[in-house]
A protein has these predicted regions:
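Mid-chain, well-packed structural core segment of small domains
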Residues: 95-104, 111
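PIN/NYN-family metal-dependent endoribonuclease catalytic core
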Residues: 5-58, 76, 139-145
Length: 149
């Protein structure tokens, strides 16, 4: 079964302004991915960091909507000392602390793909793919690739 880690940018995307084509298409891709996780075709992995980052969303209505998407997860990863240590290594690649923790959790969970809509993160890791144990991709690009196979 395909194991998928969505960062909080992805989980927020369906609630962003969908009048922009990119946002609308990414939202549709994310909702399709979540539907496949709900149907049991794929497995959604979340982490303690996912919940901590969602807790920082200032708008309570949005926070509850994003939190509701977590209900379909199949695996929950707690942060331990090995994840913290790995996150510090990932931060040396100029990756922000929360992003590094997400990536370290995804690596420890042995996910098949880590999805994010964060272009800055994707650019940083594209220069350092060799140093990571998980593939990071934009959800629209990845879903298009998977569907066309």
């Amino acid at each position: 079964m395909m194991k998928i880690y969505l960062d909080v940018c992805c989980l927020n995307r369906p609630f962003d302004d969908s009048t922009q084509d990119r946002i609308r298409l990414e939202s549709e891709a994310i909702l399709t991915i979540l539907e496949r996780c709900l149907s049991g075709n794929w497995s959604l992995v979340i982490s303690e960091i996912t919940e901590a980052e969602i807790d920082r969303i200032p708008n309570n209505d949005r926070k509850q909507k994003v939190r509701s998407l977590l209900l379909i997860h199949r695996e929950y990863r707690m942060v331990d000392t090995s994840i913290e240590k790995r996150a510090k290594e990932i931060q040396k690649l100029t990756v922000k602390a929360y992003d590094a923790l997400h990536i370290a959790c995804a690596e420890k969970s042995k996910v098949d793909i880590f999805l994010t809509t964060d272009d800055s993160l994707l650019n940083k890791v594209s220069r350092n793919r060799h140093a990571l144990k998980v593939r990071l991709e934009n959800p629209l690009k990845w879903l298009t690739e998977v569907i066309s196979q």
